[in-house]
């Protein structure tokens, strides 16, 4: 049942691909605004490739103390390494006594193993000591479910064609309303059932289809604006958010991507800049 005054907010902390230099790597936050700045009101999805995640959180007005759940889609550096910095500040906060409660890290078995190894190699022993005590690393499985922000979440294996196992998720954030994310590869037919009829879909689009010969996204397991929009149209997605893009012309990215996408997609198409937010 929808709570009085309830608002779920989606903030795109980063919108760029792995080697982006003019915007941050693709990642976003989901917040239950009804909880204000109370502990546990922020769910972080991926964290980019470095401590720039701390800058993006600060610029977005998101207190890292409010993050109690982090999901990392796969082990590529532009998604995983920023999570080490999240673990760093959380564990340090616990050590100093100013971080309340537990922290839950979600990812497939490859992600969890990598995060565990990096944390024990790179954090001080007094920080990594919280892993397994108040910081819990959860290896998710295909069609596995949990509760995050008090809402049901289903994880799914995207059947990656790339070099790393990758998972997406679908969250029912309000009765009958679903937000889904398919990671940084095009959604495949094996997972259409998780996304069909979704209220919001966060999906990669490396470049415009008009620029496919310039960027050649398919060999690196990415797709185009037109392809992502055609999939969203086929699945009757209400709102499509494109991210994980090239960053060669950010000043015109939005208008050019929108023009191509709207030719095949009749829903609400969004091509956000870094730090752009949406009320769901």
Model regions and ranges:
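Conserved beta-strand hairpin/beta-sheet module of binuclear metal-dependent hydrolase folds
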Residues: 4-60, 165-183
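Metallo-beta-lactamase
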Residues: 99-165, 274
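Short gly/ser/thr-rich secondary-structure transition/capping motifs
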Residues: 52-54, 134-138, 180-186, 222
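Cap/insert and terminal regions of metallo-dependent hydrolase folds
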Residues: 186-275
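Active-site metal-binding motif and surrounding structural segment of the metallo-beta-lactamase
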Residues: 51-103
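Active-site-proximal loop/helix segment associated with metal-binding centers of metalloenzymes
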Residues: 20-23, 139-194, 198-210
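Active-site neighborhood of phospho(di)ester-bond hydrolases with catalytic His/Asp-centered motifs
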Residues: 44-48, 67-75, 108, 179-183, ...
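Divalent metal-coordination and catalytic microenvironments
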Residues: 10, 46, 57, 74, ...
């Amino acid at each position: 049942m929808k709570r009085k005054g309830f608002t779920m907010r989606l903030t795109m902390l980063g919108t760029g691909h792995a080697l982006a230099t003019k915007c941050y790597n693709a990642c976003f936050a989901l917040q239950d605004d009804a909880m204000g700045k109370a502990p546990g009101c922020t769910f972080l999805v991926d964290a980019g490739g470095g401590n720039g995640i701390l800058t993006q959180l600060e610029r977005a007005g998101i207190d890292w103390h409010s993050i109690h759940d982090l999901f990392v889609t796969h082990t590529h550096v532009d998604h995983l390494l920023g999570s080490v910095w999240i673990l760093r500040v959380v564990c340090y906060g616990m050590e100093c006594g100013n971080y309340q409660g537990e922290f839950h890290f979600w990812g497939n078995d490859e992600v969890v193993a990598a995060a565990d190894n990096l944390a024990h190699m790179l954090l001080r022993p007094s920080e990594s000591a919280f892993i397994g005590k108040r910081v819990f690393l959860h290896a998710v499985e295909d069609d596995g479910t949990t509760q995050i922000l008090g809402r049901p979440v289903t994880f799914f294996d995207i059947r990656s064609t790339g070099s790393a196992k990758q998972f997406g998720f679908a969250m029912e954030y309000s009765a009958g309303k679903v937000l889904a994310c398919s990671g940084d590869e095009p959604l495949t037919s094996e997972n259409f059932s998780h996304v069909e009829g979704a209220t919001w879909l966060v999906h990669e689009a490396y470049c415009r289809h008009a620029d496919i010969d310039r960027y050649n996204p398919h060999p690196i397991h990415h797709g185009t604006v037109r392809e992502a929009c055609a999939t969203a149209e086929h699945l009757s997605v209400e709102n499509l958010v494109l991210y994980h893009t090239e960053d060669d012309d950010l000043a015109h990215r939005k208008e050019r991507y929108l023009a191509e996408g709207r030719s095949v997609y009749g829903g609400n198409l969004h091509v956000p800049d870094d730090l752009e937010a949406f009320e769901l």
